[in-house]
Amino acid sequence: MSFPVGRVGFIHEESKGVLPLNSTNKCITRLPPATGVKDGLVWEESVDQAHLDLRFEVLREGLPRGSEHYPGIDEDARTRFLCAYEGGRLVGCSTLQTDEREGCRFRIRGMAVSPDFRNRGIGSRIVKRLQKHASEQGTGIWCNARIRAVPMYKRCGFVEVSDVFEIEGIGLHHDMEWK
């Protein structure tokens, strides 16, 4: 899997503050800012504690700490993480997993936007960037979308390919695809 190299930008690491991008940092691309996303979108090669904390806050309510980690996926060298930063703060994240099925090579997992930053287009911007990457690879994307996120995915061109189903302890979902 190849990811484009972008212009110089910044990434946030909890223990070191904001660092300039260089070959030793985890970030491999920086995209231009979008309205409402002051610092823009950043591809990262590994998941950090801020990413796990946001996943836990948004996606794992009522579940034990540690459930926000995806064993085997977060450590897979093919997995990438697209994060949205505003003012140096992680406000949105997603995991792009290589998980092939007919017409789709990638799967979106762990898509989360901080409650304080919802309804600003951050989630759509993340999804559209994931779609751009998949399109460049000549493939589609699939996901298990929570019911409340289905309208956003539809606005981004995804279609429902399943009836509603429940993921125990997490809630109701639709299987969705974009090709």
Label each region the model flagged.
Residues 76-78, 102, 167-172:
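Short acidic/glycine-enriched loop/turn segments that link adjacent beta-strands
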Residues 117, 121-129:
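Conserved acetyl-CoA pyrophosphate-binding loop and the N-cap/start of the following alpha-helix
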Residues 83, 89-99, 105-112:
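Conserved beta-strand in the GNAT
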Residues 142, 159-175:
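Conserved catalytic-core motifs of GNAT/GCN5-like acyltransferases
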Residues 22-89:
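Short amphipathic alpha-helix that is part of the acyltransferase structural core
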Residues 127, 134-146:
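Conserved GNAT acetyl-CoA-binding A-motif
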Residues 55, 153, 158:
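Conserved active-site tyrosine of GNAT-family acetyltransferases
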